[in-house]
């Protein structure tokens, strides 16, 4: 991997200037500036290099930052190879915080209809609620029927308030007319976020007709 990327990841992990004292400004730290730098990357040549780095790197903190760099590049240039790699890597990681970060990043990426979403689908059924919610969000930005069907399945089998809220949010983004009957059931909800979320999702779906 190019020295620039190695240096960037090292700077993202650098906490040497993070002194939690009065007047401390986190936006001036080495890691904060490096993270903002990573968010702007658009070089396609970095994709393969970062993929190779992740596959070999044993240090999970470095892998975590490399994932961040990769999904920012994938978002900025709509790189499907990077997106598919990130989804595939869900099955390789075990740290829930890394997985949540990956899933939250994947949520922002365009996923073509033929993209294999199996690992995301499995994560929506995880026993850890943080993982479930991030995975439900990761089903956004796709036209896949499988994604919509999984979210509808979740709604048909849950009473958990937050499962419902996250599912409705994803349907706002990807739902079709077949989601409307299920969403309409939540219009009578006494929970404001559920009721308003369902209203907004139905309206957004109808705009897409």
Predicted regions: what they are:
Residues 1-19, 41-55, 76-91, 111-125, ...:
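Amphipathic alpha-helical scaffolding segments comprising HEAT/armadillo-like alpha-solenoid repeats
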Residues 21-42, 64-77, 97-112, 130-144, ...:
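Structural detector for internal amphipathic alpha-helices that build alpha-solenoid repeat scaffolds
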Residues 27, 58-59, 94-95, 127-128, ...:
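Short inter-helical turns and helix N-cap capping residues of alpha-solenoid HEAT/ARM repeat scaffolds
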């Amino acid at each position: 991997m190019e020295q620039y990327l190695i240096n960037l990841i090292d700077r993202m992990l650098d906490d040497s200037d993070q002194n939690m004292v009065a007047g401390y400004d986190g936006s001036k730290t080495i890691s904060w500036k490096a993270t903002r730098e990573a968010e702007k990357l658009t070089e396609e040549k970095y994709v393969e290099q970062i993929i190779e780095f992740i596959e070999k790197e044993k240090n999970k903190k470095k892998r975590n930052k490399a994932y961040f760099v990769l999904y920012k590049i994938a978002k900025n240039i709509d790189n499907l190879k990077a997106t598919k790699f990130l989804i595939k890597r869900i099955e390789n990681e075990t740290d829930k915080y890394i997985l949540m970060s990956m899933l939250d990043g994947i949520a922002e990426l365009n996923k073509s209809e033929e993209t294999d979403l199996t690992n995301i689908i499995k994560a929506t059924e995880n026993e850890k609620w943080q993982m479930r919610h991030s995975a439900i969000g990761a089903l956004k930005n796709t036209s896949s029927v499988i994604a919509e069907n999984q979210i509808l399945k979740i709604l048909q089998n849950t009473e958990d308030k937050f499962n419902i809220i996250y599912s409705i949010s994803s349907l706002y983004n990807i739902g079709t007319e077949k989601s409307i009957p299920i969403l309409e059931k939540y219009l009578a909800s006494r929970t404001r976020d559920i009721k308003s979320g369902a209203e907004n999702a139905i309206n957004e779906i109808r705009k897409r007709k």
